[in-house]
Amino acid sequence: MQEIESLHQSVLLQEVLQAFAPLEEGVLIDCTLGLGGHSKALLSQKPHLKLIGIDKDKFAQEIAKERLKAFEGRYNLLSGGFAKRFKEALEMHGERIKGVLVDLGVSSLQLDDDNRGFNFHSHALDMRMDLESDLNAQKVINSYSVVALEKIFRDYGEIKEYKKIAHKIAERRAKKPFKDAKDLSDFLSSFSKNKKIHPATLVFQAVRIEVNSELEELKEFLQCARNLKGAILCVISFHSLEDALVKNAFKDYAKNCICDPSSFKCTCSNNHALGTILTKKPIIPSPEEIKNNRRSRSAKMRVFQFKP
């Protein structure tokens, strides 16, 4: 546990604490509990706050539970997808919910575990957040049709040569199926010309998003979050697809006029905004944080305040 405390670094921790500074009591939902770094800091600073922590990864949740021992009685941990669990919590707690945090990053524990398949050198080709899920990365890479691979590489990886990569993977797996993440990573490196990032980065991102239904879950959550009243919503994203969904949802929440854009005149009374966007531009890590934690470099945090 001491090793976890020293190695685990919660992204934008001080900025998250600042975002929730106005909260004094009520319920805060950490939709992506992970190892509990953000939750631990918030419970430490807010003695009257109650916490609901949600995570698909039961192993990570056990570690978080150990880290939160000092706050026994002030938190409740739930397993499962955060969109579904958040909806249930919202129905149960309603306006007692004063804050919601979503950190969409993969935890260091998952990235560094060679048995999980998230890194380029893993001995597995898995990438599941929920180890009880049926779909894993090996099934995607070795059994998806070429057309299906093209679609996820284009839509989830934003890969320019998505057709070429899908066809090369299909040709190679016909001779010899991919056995682990290192095998896939080495294969992609053998023909990719991308020098800015590791040749496997965007393919791994696309497959991980597919395996965990990440964008669908985020969309479902953002739709449900419209029903919050008087709460602060803080979302940390790590790539442009996530950030675009959050940015557009917040803009939609803040709209006063809900008339059809083709209308010549507003007839809706122009007062339908659900609240206020508190971050005109996303908050990003400081150079010092990036220096201390390279994995934080692509993080973007957006904050929205819902009206009571």
UniProtKB/Swiss-Prot annotation:
- The EC code for this enzyme is 2.1.1.199
Q: Which domain of life is it from?
A: Bacteria
Root EC class: transferase
GO (cellular component) term, any one:
cytoplasm
The compartments listed are:
Cytoplasm
Q: What are the entry keywords?
A: Cytoplasm, Methyltransferase, rRNA processing, S-adenosyl-L-methionine, Transferase
Q: Name one Pfam family in it.
A: Methyltransf_5
Q: Give the primary localization class.
A: cytoplasm
SUPFAM superfamilies per the record? Answer: Putative methyltransferase TM0872, insert domain (SSF81799), S-adenosyl-L-methionine-dependent methyltransferases (SSF53335)
Show which residues constitute the signal peptide.
Answer: none
Instruction: Provide the binding site for S-adenosyl-L-methionine.
Output: 36-38, 55, 86, 103, 110
Biological-process GO terms, alphabetical: rRNA base methylation
Molecular function in Gene Ontology: rRNA (cytosine-N4-)-methyltransferase activity
Q: Which reaction does it catalyse?
A: cytidine(1402) in 16S rRNA + S-adenosyl-L-methionine = N(4)-methylcytidine(1402) in 16S rRNA + S-adenosyl-L-homocysteine + H(+)
- Report the PANTHER family cross-referenced here: 12S RRNA N4-METHYLCYTIDINE METHYLTRANSFERASE, S-ADENOSYL-METHYLTRANSFERASE MRAW
The entry assigns this protein to a family as follows: Belongs to the methyltransferase superfamily. RsmH family.
Q: What does this protein do?
A: Specifically methylates the N4 position of cytidine in position 1402 (C1402) of 16S rRNA.
Protein name in the entry: Ribosomal RNA small subunit methyltransferase H
Q: Which organism does this record belong to?
A: Helicobacter pylori (strain P12)
Name the gene behind this protein: rsmH
